[in-house]
Amino acid sequence: MRACILKVNMVLAGKNYDTPSTPKVVGETTAKVLKEHVPTDLAGVVFLSGGQTVEQATDNLAKIEKNGPFPWPVTFSFARALQDPALYAWAGNNANTDTARQAFLARLKANAEALKAQG
């Protein structure tokens, strides 16, 4: 297990649930499930953004981190939540490359800051 990295979704309310999960609930519930069920000798845990908005994914990541410490490193493995703002800024126009790059870096920085949110 020491060489395994677990790639998981955050614990969120289902699509048919009337009330979306708050970042506080996502953080507490996700941390609880991981601490109770994931072996401590794992190499790390990485989170998917799982269809969340860019902001939701970052806010939820910060709240999960606040519910640490964890016995393994925790980080993000977002695709859409990092790429969408950059792709939107680029809009298929190479003249927008620098703006797209800045949008991508802004999301990376926001998520890196979320990982510093230890409680």
Question: Which positions does each model-derived feature cover?
Answer:
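Active-site capping/gating regions of soluble enzymes
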Residues: 1-119
